[in-house]
């Protein structure tokens, strides 16, 4: 009887272990091609072509050439009203090439607008949006304009369309970016992350209340709530893709919501990576990259998004988030900006 019980225990263990760990034959691998040693932690990036704009925490904003692997510029602060001000802690950055702008935010502060043109001068313009900005995304508009969506941790979803405004005071030309339209939609949740396709949809991660989806007729028009999904855990970031949305939910792993599910506004989201703490998700084709903080990254095969398959966990340092650059993977880490190749 004891022998039989031991055999049964072994069978159960093998079954459970096999469910948790991917089959060794199906595990992918990664190759670390380059590490760009940014000054300070590489917290966030915005990539345009082969140029990366890096949010480097207390080390400010840095501009890197990814192809050559060299730093082109670094800005620890900026001049405002005759004084030089150092950055406290840059958390987010985004580049608007058409308007020659760089947007940056420090933790829980407004979005700062800087001009950065062909002369490579980093010129402060003004601040926009909310004092409690957690995340933002911006889209260029014709006629020297842009439209921005913001996850405001106090007020909800904010949006606005801004235009360049020039005034002259004592023969001094002052250029600011002023709102021409905008507003906000309140939510019971605490917005943490935001994404938009720039065409008709905005998605916002709202902490303990899950994820919300908003639709708009044209870019710059008022978004209206389309659907809301209450997910386990704390929804921190959301990534919109062609097939739906991927949501990172901290200690409760990740979720996938198909476009059909979002449109219907009801049904069960697909949960995966339940045993992992997921801070951020990026996707490219059939690959999903989950950022795990101190545990590195986890790779998933999402060729069947209704059943994501694990393809391995890789200790590549402390990872904040990831982004695909052509067919390679960029990792924002405490050791700098890492460039990897995924061997699938």
Q: Where are each of the predicted segments found?
A:
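Sec-dependent bacterial lipoprotein signal peptides
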Residues: 1-18
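Feature marking well-ordered beta-strand scaffolds used for ligand recognition
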Residues: 19-344
């Amino acid at each position: 009887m004891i022998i039989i019980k031991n055999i049964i225990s072994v069978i159960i263990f093998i079954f459970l272990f096999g469910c948790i760990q991917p089959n060794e034959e199906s595990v992918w691998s990664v190759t670390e091609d380059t590490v760009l040693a940014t000054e300070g932690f590489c917290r966030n990036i915005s990539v345009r072509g082969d140029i990366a704009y890096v949010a480097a925490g207390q080390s400010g904003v840095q501009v890197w050439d990814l192809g050559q692997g060299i730093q082109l510029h670094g800005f620890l602060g900026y001049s405002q009203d005759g004084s030089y001000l150092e950055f406290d802690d840059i958390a987010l950055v985004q580049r608007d090439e058409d308007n020659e702008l760089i947007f940056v935010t420090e933790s829980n502060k407004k979005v700062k607008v800087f001009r950065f043109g062909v002369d490579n001068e980093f010129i402060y313009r003004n601040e926009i949006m909310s004092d409690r900005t957690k995340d933002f995304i911006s889209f260029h508009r014709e006629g020297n304009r842009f439209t921005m969506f913001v996850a405001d941790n106090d007020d909800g979803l904010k949006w606005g369309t801004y235009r360049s405004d020039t005034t002259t005071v004592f023969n001094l030309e002052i250029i600011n970016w002023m709102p021409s339209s905008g507003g906000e939609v309140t939510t019971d949740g605490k917005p943490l992350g935001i994404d938009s396709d720039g065409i008709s949809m905005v998605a916002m991660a709202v902490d303990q209340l899950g994820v919300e989806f908003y639709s708009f007729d044209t870019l710059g028009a008022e978004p209206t709530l389309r659907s809301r999904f209450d997910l386990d855990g704390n929804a921190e970031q959301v990534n919109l893709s062609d097939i739906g949305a991927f949501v990172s939910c901290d200690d409760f792993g990740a979720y996938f919501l198909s476009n059909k599910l979002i449109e219907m506004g009801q049904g069960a989201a697909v949960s995966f990576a339940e045993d992992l703490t997921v801070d951020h998700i990026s996707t490219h084709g059939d690959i999903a990259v989950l950022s795990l903080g101190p545990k590195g990254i986890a790779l998933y095969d999402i060729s069947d998004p209704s059943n994501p398959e694990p393809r391995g966990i890789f200790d590549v340092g402390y990872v904040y988030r990831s982004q695909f650059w052509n067919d390679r993977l960029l990792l924002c880490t405490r050791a700098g900006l890492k460039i990897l190749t995924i061997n699938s």
